[in-house]
Amino acid sequence: MFTIACLITFLWLCFGYSLSFSPCLENGGTKEVFGDAGRLWLRGMMKNTVHALAPTIPEALFCAYQLTFAIITAALICGSFADRMKYHSMIIFIMFWHLLVYCPLAHSNWHFHGWLYQLGCLDFAGGNVVHICSGASTADNH
């Protein structure tokens, strides 16, 4: 599990936060599903910047808070891999799963431009992103 925590932390800080929560440009074609590259490698994030979803705290704190959701969701899935998948296969799967499943779902649910958010989807305490995403991915693994 520590490997998963380290892997997700690296992916989140490099790519995941930008794909999930970067301020979308109006000319972006996929702003309903993915964020843009505005925060790749946390570019443009200063100690006094804030995110529109959490305007009362620094954006770095918001990024760290959302990182905990990303780690927990990946850890929930790894519980279903016991004796079913080799270790290196699990690492590769989680890497692609995080970037292609978790990040688009987090953006769609929690970002102002996300298509589920625009439909009025309410996600209290991460139920849609964390539990539905990890549960469906776990069920698919069996």
PLM region descriptions:
Residues 1-142:
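Hydrophobic alpha-helical transmembrane bundles of multi-pass membrane proteins
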